[in-house]
Amino acid sequence: MIVSMLAATDLARILDGRRIADDLLDALKTRVDARVAAGKLPPTLAVVLVGSDPASVVYVRNKRRAAEKVGIKAYDFDLPEATTEAELAALIDRLNADPKIHGILIQLPLPGIPDAHRLIQRVDPRKDVDGFHPQNVGHLALREFGLRPCTPRGIVTLLGHTDRPVRGRNATIVGVSNHVGRPMGLELLMAGCTVTSCHKFTPPQMLEAAVRQADILIVAVGRPGVIPGEWVKPGAVVIDVGINRLDDGRLVGDVGFESAVKRASWITPVPGGVGPMTVATLMQNTLEAAEAADC
């Protein structure tokens, strides 16, 4: 059973990503409604899906539903799995040139296309609402305005809903992917944390030590239970980005939840923690892309 408040047993409070994401979407809808009332176009999002991977289909459906809730107009581009890189590049070029399109979402992975990064770089950075383009990551590194990667930005929003300070805290990130771990480090540096990043070359004893000293622990590896809950520092805030399906069908994170919940002050559930925030932040970026296009 998920714990919703700090109980007498000192279990962690749950960072309910679904509730916080819904609140963010409601706030975005208010801004979109005001925009439309002022005679401006509603924000628009081109959603590009290649193939029919079940997980990708679910993710795209969730993003389309969120767009509809906020008042963002989504344009669907559902392409066959045999779509070539050249064909996808041509579509991206058309969307880049279309002033009625504010945001472009390329759902990853792209079947049959070995270098998705090359296509991500082709998206106009001003329409890169995923925040994956090197120019947008560079803006984040330089603490400049840009479209920030959705999952790290959503995690920062989650951290703001705890009663724990962020500035001056020790933060450990486990996992250094381009889309989560690396930009997460930049976000936390900007927030005033002292950041330690761990990866596959980090010796096990060093990994354990880094986790045990973390006031804020963010794990994004994609391996169930890779971080034992017993390692969590008492009172730490734990953000579990991993989502893994076990043989029995259960979805679990990268952190041993049953033991971590007894040590942390706040912890995200899996599912229902980081995932909804990523989707809501995508809508936030899309609205900001539309607002920037007005200037």
Swiss-Prot record:
Keywords from the named record: Amino-acid biosynthesis, Histidine biosynthesis, Hydrolase, Methionine biosynthesis, Multifunctional enzyme, NADP, One-carbon metabolism, Oxidoreductase, Purine biosynthesis
Source organism superkingdom: Bacteria
Pathway: One-carbon metabolism; tetrahydrofolate interconversion
Keyword Electron transport recorded: no
Residues noted as binding NADP(+) in the record, renumbered to the chain: G175, V176, S177, I243
Function: Catalyzes the oxidation of 5,10-methylenetetrahydrofolate to 5,10-methenyltetrahydrofolate and then the hydrolysis of 5,10-methenyltetrahydrofolate to 10-formyltetrahydrofolate.
Gene Ontology terms: biological process: L-histidine biosynthetic process; methionine biosynthetic process; purine nucleotide biosynthetic process; tetrahydrofolate interconversion
NADP found in the keyword field: yes
HAMAP family, per database record: THF_DHG_CYH
UniProt family annotation: Belongs to the tetrahydrofolate dehydrogenase/cyclohydrolase family.
NCBIfam families xref list: PRK10792.1
EC code: 1.5.1.5, 3.5.4.9
Subunit and partners: Homodimer.
Name of the gene encoding the protein in the UniProt record: folD
Organism lineage: Bacteria, Pseudomonadati, Pseudomonadota, Gammaproteobacteria, Lysobacterales
Protein name per UniProt: Bifunctional protein FolD
Swiss-Prot/TrEMBL catalytic activity: (6R)-5,10-methylene-5,6,7,8-tetrahydrofolate + NADP(+) = (6R)-5,10-methenyltetrahydrofolate + NADPH; (6R)-5,10-methenyltetrahydrofolate + H2O = (6R)-10-formyltetrahydrofolate + H(+)
A Gene Ontology molecular function term of the record: methylenetetrahydrofolate dehydrogenase (NADP+) activity
GO CC, alphabetical: cytosol
